C-alpha cells in the first residue's frame, strides 16, 4: 500500500546562486556521506547533484506527510548512489517501509519523485 507520493522541482541557477552566497548551504542539505559523493564532481555537475538531492529530500518530506521543520531536517534524510548509479534513500527508513526515489535533470532544473510504500 502506498503511504505517500512526493514530487519536487528546483531551478539549477537558484541553487548555484544560494551556494555562491552561502557555501555552508551544502552542510545544511547534505549528510557527511552525501558530501563525499558531492566532492567527486566538478563544475555544473556539482550543482546538478546538490539540486537533485535537495529536490529528492523535499519530495521525501512531502511523501512522508511531514514536510521539513520540527521533526525532520534535510540532514535527517540521506540519499546515496548505489553501485549501479541509482539513488537510494538510506535514512530514515521505518520498519516495513520501502522508499523509491527518482531524480532527473534538465539544463535548467532538477526534479525528484519519491514513493513510500508500507
Curated annotation (Swiss-Prot):
Example of a GO cellular component annotation carried by this entry: cytoplasm
Compartments where located: Cytoplasm
Pfam families registered for this protein in UniProt: ACPS (PF01648)
Signal peptide segment: none
Keyword annotations of the record: Cytoplasm, Fatty acid biosynthesis, Fatty acid metabolism, Lipid biosynthesis, Lipid metabolism, Magnesium, Metal-binding, Transferase
GO molecular function, one term: holo-[acyl-carrier-protein] synthase activity
SUPFAM superfamilies membership: 4'-phosphopantetheinyl transferase
GO biological process, one term: fatty acid biosynthetic process
Catalytic activity, EC: 2.7.8.7
Cofactor(s) this protein cannot do without: Mg(2+)
Top-rank EC class of the record's enzyme: transferase
Similarity section: Belongs to the P-Pant transferase superfamily. AcpS family.
Function: Transfers the 4'-phosphopantetheine moiety from coenzyme A to a Ser of acyl-carrier-protein.
Name of this chain's protein: Holo-[acyl-carrier-protein] synthase
Source organism per UniProt: Listeria welshimeri serovar 6b (strain ATCC 35897 / DSM 20650 / CCUG 15529 / CIP 8149 / NCTC 11857 / SLCC 5334 / V8)
Record lineage: Bacteria, Bacillati, Bacillota, Bacilli, Bacillales
Amino acid at each position: 500500500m502506498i503511504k505517500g507520493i512526493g514530487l519536487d522541482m528546483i531551478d539549477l541557477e537558484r541553487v548555484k546562486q544560494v551556494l555562491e552566497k552561502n557555501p555552508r548551504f551544502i552542510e545544511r542539505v547534505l549528510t557527511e556521506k552525501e558530501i563525499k559523493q558531492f566532492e567527486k564532481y566538478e563544475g555544473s555537475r556539482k550543482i546538478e547533484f546538490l539540486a537533485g538531492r535537495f529536490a529528492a529530500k523535499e519530495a521525501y518530506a512531502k511523501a512522508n506527510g511531514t514536510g521539513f521543520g520540527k521533526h525532520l531536517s534535510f540532514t535527517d534524510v540521506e540519499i546515496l548512489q548505489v553501485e549501479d548509479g541509482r539513488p537510494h534513500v538510506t535514512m530514515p527508513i521505518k520498519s516495513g517501509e520501502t522508499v523509491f526515489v527518482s531524480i532527473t535533470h534538465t539544463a535548467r532544473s532538477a526534479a525528484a519523485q519519491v514513493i513510500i510504500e508500507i
